[in-house]
Amino acid sequence: MEGDIAEMGKFIGAGLATIGLGGAGIGVGHVAGNFLAGALRNPSAAPGQMANLFVGIAFAEALGIFSFLIALLLMFAV
Protein backbone atom coordinates (compact mmCIF):
# COMPACT_ATOMS: atom_id res chain seq x y z
CA MET A 1 0.00 0.00 0.00
CA GLU A 2 2.75 2.45 0.91
CA GLY A 3 4.67 1.65 -2.28
CA ASP A 4 1.58 2.40 -4.34
CA ILE A 5 1.22 5.82 -2.74
CA ALA A 6 4.89 6.55 -3.45
CA GLU A 7 4.44 5.52 -7.09
CA MET A 8 1.36 7.70 -7.36
CA GLY A 9 3.32 10.65 -5.95
CA LYS A 10 6.09 10.11 -8.49
CA PHE A 11 3.66 10.14 -11.39
CA ILE A 12 1.83 13.20 -10.10
CA GLY A 13 5.15 15.01 -9.66
CA ALA A 14 6.26 14.03 -13.15
CA GLY A 15 2.97 15.26 -14.58
CA LEU A 16 3.33 18.58 -12.79
CA ALA A 17 6.91 18.91 -14.04
CA THR A 18 5.72 18.66 -17.63
CA ILE A 19 3.74 21.89 -17.28
CA GLY A 20 6.97 23.59 -18.33
CA LEU A 21 6.65 21.99 -21.76
CA GLY A 22 3.55 24.06 -22.43
CA GLY A 23 5.41 27.15 -21.29
CA ALA A 24 8.19 26.39 -23.75
CA GLY A 25 5.69 26.16 -26.59
CA ILE A 26 4.15 29.47 -25.62
CA GLY A 27 7.61 31.06 -25.35
CA VAL A 28 8.67 29.88 -28.80
CA GLY A 29 5.42 31.21 -30.22
CA HIS A 30 6.00 34.63 -28.70
CA VAL A 31 9.59 34.80 -29.90
CA ALA A 32 8.73 33.75 -33.45
CA GLY A 33 5.64 35.96 -33.56
CA ASN A 34 7.53 39.04 -32.44
CA PHE A 35 10.29 38.33 -34.95
CA LEU A 36 7.76 37.97 -37.74
CA ALA A 37 6.01 41.20 -36.75
CA GLY A 38 9.32 43.05 -36.75
CA ALA A 39 10.40 41.50 -40.05
CA LEU A 40 7.16 42.56 -41.69
CA ARG A 41 7.59 46.13 -40.42
CA ASN A 42 11.21 46.42 -41.53
CA PRO A 43 12.20 43.66 -43.98
CA SER A 44 15.72 45.01 -44.43
CA ALA A 45 16.53 44.45 -40.73
CA ALA A 46 15.22 40.86 -40.63
CA PRO A 47 18.48 39.11 -41.60
CA GLY A 48 20.32 40.93 -38.82
CA GLN A 49 17.79 39.77 -36.25
CA MET A 50 17.89 36.12 -37.30
CA ALA A 51 20.62 35.28 -34.75
CA ASN A 52 18.52 36.84 -31.98
CA LEU A 53 15.58 34.72 -33.11
CA PHE A 54 17.57 31.51 -32.80
CA VAL A 55 18.99 32.47 -29.39
CA GLY A 56 15.50 33.26 -28.08
CA ILE A 57 14.09 30.00 -29.38
CA ALA A 58 17.03 28.08 -27.88
CA PHE A 59 16.45 29.62 -24.44
CA ALA A 60 12.73 28.88 -24.56
CA GLU A 61 13.31 25.29 -25.67
CA ALA A 62 16.01 24.76 -23.04
CA LEU A 63 13.46 25.36 -20.30
CA GLY A 64 11.12 22.83 -21.89
CA ILE A 65 13.86 20.24 -22.19
CA PHE A 66 14.88 20.88 -18.58
CA SER A 67 11.33 20.28 -17.33
CA PHE A 68 11.11 17.11 -19.45
CA LEU A 69 14.35 15.81 -17.91
CA ILE A 70 13.06 16.56 -14.42
CA ALA A 71 9.90 14.58 -15.21
CA LEU A 72 11.97 11.64 -16.44
CA LEU A 73 14.15 11.77 -13.33
CA LEU A 74 11.08 11.78 -11.11
CA MET A 75 9.60 8.79 -12.90
CA PHE A 76 12.64 6.55 -13.25
CA ALA A 77 15.42 7.66 -10.90
CA VAL A 78 13.59 8.53 -7.69
Curated annotation (Swiss-Prot):
The keyword Transferase does not apply. It is found in: Cell inner membrane. The record marks 61 as: Reversibly protonated during proton transport. Keywords: ATP synthesis, Cell inner membrane, Cell membrane, CF(0), Hydrogen ion transport, Ion transport, Lipid-binding, Membrane, Transmembrane, Transmembrane helix, Transport. GO terms for cellular component: plasma membrane; proton-transporting ATP synthase complex; proton-transporting two-sector ATPase complex, proton-transporting domain. It holds the Pfam family ATP-synt_C. InterPro entries: ATP_synth_F0_csu, ATP_synth_F0_csu_sf, ATPase_proteolipid_c-like_dom, F/V-ATP_Csub_sf. It is a multi-pass membrane protein. The chain crosses the membrane at residues 11-31, 53-73. GO terms for molecular function: lipid binding; proton-transporting ATP synthase activity, rotational mechanism. Its main location: membrane. NCBIfam families: PRK07558.1. Belongs to the ATPase C chain family. F(1)F(0) ATP synthase produces ATP from ADP in the presence of a proton or sodium gradient. F-type ATPases consist of two structural domains, F(1) containing the extramembraneous catalytic core and F(0) containing the membrane proton channel, linked together by a central stalk and a peripheral stalk. During catalysis, ATP synthesis in the catalytic domain of F(1) is coupled via a rotary mechanism of the central stalk subunits to proton translocation. Key component of the F(0) channel; it plays a direct role in translocation across the membrane. A homomeric c-ring of between 10-14 subunits forms the central stalk rotor element with the F(1) delta and epsilon subunits. This is ATP synthase subunit c. The lineage of its organism: Bacteria, Pseudomonadati, Pseudomonadota, Alphaproteobacteria, Rhodobacterales. The gene is atpE.
